[in-house]
C-alpha cells in the first residue's frame, strides 16, 4: 500500500479545507456577524494603525503574523509520532485554533480594535486585565526572542552554507562537510565566523521589527508582509511538489512515511494504525500537543489578531481572514510534518536527531534535501 501515506496526507488537507467551509460557517453564525456594521478601519482610520485594506492582503499578513517558523519547526519535530501528529493538526486547527483566532479577531473588531488584555479587563475586571497584561508581556518577550533568534540562526546557517558552496566546499549531498568546516572556523564570510554572521542577522531582523512597529501599518507591514506570506505558501507548495515527484521517482523514490516503516516493506494498514497509539518512551500525551502547538492551537495568536482587526473592511471578511489564516497554517504544518516523516531513513534516525537536539542546521538541511 505504497500510496496509503500520500492518501492520508491529502485526506488531512481535504478535511482542513472542508472544515473551513462547514465548521467555519457554523462559527460565523454563532458570532452573528453584521455586514452593515462599520468596522474600526473606517470608524477610526487614523492613518497609522487603523486603515482599510483588502481582505487578501490582510489574510497574507495575518498568516505571516501567526505562523512565522512555528508551523515548520514544530511539525518537523512532531513527525516522531507518525501520522497521529497530522490528526492532531487537523482536529486542533478546525475545532480549536481557528475558532480561537476567529473569535479573537471578531471581538476586537466589535470593540474598536481592542487588544485581548483590554477585553479581558472589560468583561472580567481589572485584576484579570493586569494578569493578562503581565502574562502577555512575558510570553511576547519569549516568543519575540524565538522569532528573532530562529530566523537569524537559519539565515546564518544558509549564509555560511552558500558561502561554502562558493568556496567549493560543498558537493552535491555533502552538507555535513560544510557544517564541520563552518563549525571549525574553516569558512568565513567577509572575515566573520558563523557566530558573528548570526549576530549580524539578529541585529538586522531586530531592527526590521522595530522599524515595522514604529511606522504606519501600510508602510512596511502592508507592503512587505503579504510578499513574505506568499513566499511561505510558495515554499510549502514546493515541498509538496518535491515529495510527490520524489515519491514516484523510478530511480530514488522517497516514501512519504518511511520513518515509521523500518523494515523496508510496503506499509500496511495495520502498521499505519499502530502509530496512533502511545509508543513507550515517547507518549503522545502530553508531548505531542506541546511539540506541535503553533500549527494547531496557539494562544499567542490573540496578541496578533487586533493588528489586522483594525484594518478589516467588513465583518463578513472575518472568516476568511482569521479562521482561514489558521486553516492555512494547519496545511503548512501538515506539509512540514510530512517533510519530517520523509526525510529520515527510519524511526531510530529521527529519534537520534531529536534526542541530540534538532538544530537550525539540521532543519535547514531537511528543507534543502527535500527541495
Swiss-Prot record:
The organism's place on the tree of life at top rank: Bacteria
InterPro entries: CstA (IPR051605), CstA_N (IPR003706)
Keyword terms of this UniProt record: Cell membrane, Membrane, Transmembrane, Transmembrane helix
Localization terms from the record: Cell membrane
Membrane-topology descriptor: Multi-pass membrane protein
Any one of the GO BP annotations: cellular response to starvation
One Pfam family linked to the record: CstA
Main localization, broad class: membrane
Transmembrane segments: 4-24, 60-82, 87-109, 130-150, 197-217, 224-244, 282-302, 320-340
One GO term describing the cellular component: plasma membrane
Similarity section: Belongs to the peptide transporter carbon starvation (CstA) (TC 2.A.114) family.
Protein name (Swiss-Prot/TrEMBL): Uncharacterized membrane protein HI_1126.1
Species of origin: Haemophilus influenzae (strain ATCC 51907 / DSM 11121 / KW20 / Rd)
The organism's taxonomic lineage, starting at the top: Bacteria, Pseudomonadati, Pseudomonadota, Gammaproteobacteria, Pasteurellales
